[in-house]
């Protein structure tokens, strides 16, 4: 009895005269790739809703900073203002009315994803607004101000230098030559190799 698709060959059984590979459905994107796509779509939507609407080709570092400031309204990190009695306290004892903002780490990661997405979507690296100097300066200022406001020092991680190897030269040859055997120069004797 023949099935309805008997005219097709089965690549799994090996009777396919074509290429020897089996095509599989595209792999599901990683969390990073999914987040990058969502971030990219959010940024494009922001440009579309911008007054006046802004084309990606006309986008600059200033527009990226404006976008980051816009995102602050959705933040969940309490950032104390200078006049707040809890300014500089890591664990304030009671609630205050200071604003919630996007955490510096979240903004930094977002910019990294958008920077990559821009180039993956045809943007030139030399015109990438997410890599603009103004954006880097803004992120640095956000990091420093949040560190002061929350009492958390953000210290740059110092690179661990590889340990320096000190070589010590031991002159074994002079003690060997005193034994009178020129062939054993530099080679340990069995008596020296075995502990007493």
Curated annotation (Swiss-Prot):
Cellular component GO terms, alphabetical: nucleus
Signal peptide range in chain numbering: none
PROSITE patterns: ALOG
InterPro entries (UniProt xref): ALOG (IPR040222), ALOG_dom (IPR006936)
Keyword Ion transport: no
Chain span(s) of sequence motif Nuclear localization signal: 156-160
Organism of origin: Arabidopsis thaliana
Function, in words: Probable transcription regulator that acts as a developmental regulator by promoting cell growth in response to light.
Ranges of compositional bias, category Basic and acidic residues: 1-16
Subcellular location: Nucleus
Family the UniProt entry places it in: Belongs to the plant homeotic and developmental regulators ALOG protein family.
Stretches that traverse the bilayer: none
Residue span(s) of domain ALOG: 31-158
Stretches the record annotates as Disordered: 1-36, 149-196
Protein name: Protein LIGHT-DEPENDENT SHORT HYPOCOTYLS 6
A single GO BP: post-embryonic plant morphogenesis
UniProt entry keywords in alphabetical sequence: Developmental protein, DNA-binding, Nucleus, Transcription, Transcription regulation
Gene Ontology MF annotations: DNA binding
């Amino acid at each position: 009895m023949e099935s309805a698709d008997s005219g097709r060959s089965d690549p799994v059984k090996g009777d396919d005269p074509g290429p020897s590979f089996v095509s599989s459905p595209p792999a599901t994107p990683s969390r990073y790739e999914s987040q990058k796509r969502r971030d990219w779509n959010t940024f494009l939507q922001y440009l579309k809703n911008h007054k006046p609407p802004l084309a990606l080709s006309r986008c600059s570092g200033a527009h990226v900073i404006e976008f980051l400031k816009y995102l602050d309204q959705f933040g969940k990190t309490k950032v104390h203002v200078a006049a707040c009695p809890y300014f500089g306290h890591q664990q304030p004892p009671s609630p205050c009315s200071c604003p919630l903002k996007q955490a510096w780490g979240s903004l930094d990661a977002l910019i990294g994803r958008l920077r990559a997405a821009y180039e993956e979507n045809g943007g030139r690296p030399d015109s990438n607004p997410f890599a603009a100097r103004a954006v880097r300066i803004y992120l640095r200022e956000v990091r420093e101000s949040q560190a002061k406001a929350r009492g958390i020092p953000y210290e740059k991680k110092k690179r661990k230098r590889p340990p320096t190897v000190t070589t010590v030269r031991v002159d074994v040859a002079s003690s060997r030559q005193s034994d009178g055997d020129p062939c054993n120069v530099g080679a340990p004797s069995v008596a020296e190799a075995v502990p007493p």
